[in-house]
């Protein structure tokens, strides 16, 4: 590897603010904020959505049936092309 061209890879804390969950993982993201976690200071980044708060992963997503969508379309625009 060439010296001086690669970003600084380090442990960073990501905070999902909507679920109040902290993730400590490796990243090259740049930030000026820090947080102390378990006695160690880490770079700190806030995020809005993670697997702890996204409806797909939490099982709270809404299911839409295709039949309902088709029927709704036909009801609105079915006579338009006749």
From Swiss-Prot:
GO terms for molecular function: structural constituent of ribosome. It comes from the Bacteria. InterPro entries: Ribosomal_bL28/bL31-like_sf (IPR034704), Ribosomal_bL31 (IPR002150), Ribosomal_bL31_B (IPR027493), Ribosomal_bL31_sf (IPR042105). Keywords: Ribonucleoprotein, Ribosomal protein. Disulfide bonds: none annotated. One of its GO terms (biological process) is translation. One of its GO terms (cellular component) is ribonucleoprotein complex. Transmembrane segments: none annotated. The keyword Iron-sulfur does not apply. Belongs to the bacterial ribosomal protein bL31 family. Type B subfamily. Part of the 50S ribosomal subunit. PANTHER family: 50S RIBOSOMAL PROTEIN L31, CHLOROPLASTIC, LARGE RIBOSOMAL SUBUNIT PROTEIN BL31C. This is Large ribosomal subunit protein bL31B. It comes from Pectobacterium carotovorum subsp. carotovorum (strain PC1). The gene is rpmE2.
């Amino acid at each position: 590897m060439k010296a001086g061209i690669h970003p600084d890879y380090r442990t960073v804390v990501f905070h999902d603010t909507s679920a109040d969950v902290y993730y400590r993982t490796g990243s090259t993201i740049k930030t000026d904020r820090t947080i102390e976690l378990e006695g160690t200071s880490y770079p700190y980044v806030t995020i809005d959505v993670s697997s702890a708060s996204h409806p797909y992963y939490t099982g709270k997503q809404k299911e839409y049936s295709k039949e309902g969508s088709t029927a709704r379309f036909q009801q609105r625009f079915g006579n338009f092309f006749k």
